[in-house]
């Protein structure tokens, strides 16, 4: 039996994983549950982990997996339910002798180069190579992939060297992680917020300042839907 706060937090994490492919930060959890400190979130996370509803992944920034869901949130995840984060093994890593082959419908996406998760870099529009992603990750619409350069989104679980999967769109809701084109020349991966006639591009790393620009200087090029990480 979960308390109301535990259930509310689990639902919030689940919805963010479904929407963004990455879990919310502790600050976002604190605001969503109207708590005064992060210590309350730590206690709730620990309780959910002890009860087997979530799993924290070691040595990764803000990495949480949902293991199961209570009936009030739709029951346990169906077969194949996974956060939309792919941890890829190195190609030279030996396969266990008892490993069974698994067939997954894959889609080839163009990797359009590197995107800055830091100071914006020049916009890239040339395909460097292709990457295979599960078909369930992309859904409808046009998609492409970008390799992340920088550490400004580490608290969103996005690290330097990760490959992000982007759905093409020219619109975004507040809080979406987007590919933003600044002045038609610089591309950056940031969280999007509309502030009146301006656009705020917010990093997920306190070392980076939020950039607030007139809306006519920013064009949304796509929204984050998944992430691929190789060790």
UniProtKB/Swiss-Prot annotation:
User: Briefly, what is this protein's role?
Assistant: Represses a number of genes involved in the response to DNA damage (SOS response), including recA and lexA. In the presence of single-stranded DNA, RecA interacts with LexA causing an autocatalytic cleavage which disrupts the DNA-binding part of LexA, leading to derepression of the SOS regulon and eventually DNA repair.
What are the EC numbers?
3.4.21.88
Q: What is this protein called?
A: LexA repressor
What is the organism field in this record? Ruegeria pomeroyi (strain ATCC 700808 / DSM 15171 / DSS-3) (Silicibacter pomeroyi)
Family listed: Belongs to the peptidase S24 family.
Task: Quote one Gene Ontology molecular function term.
Answer: DNA binding
**Where are the compositionally biased (Basic and acidic residues) regions?**
86-95
**What Pfam families would the database entry show?**
LexA_DNA_bind, Peptidase_S24
Query: Gene that codes for this?
Result: lexA
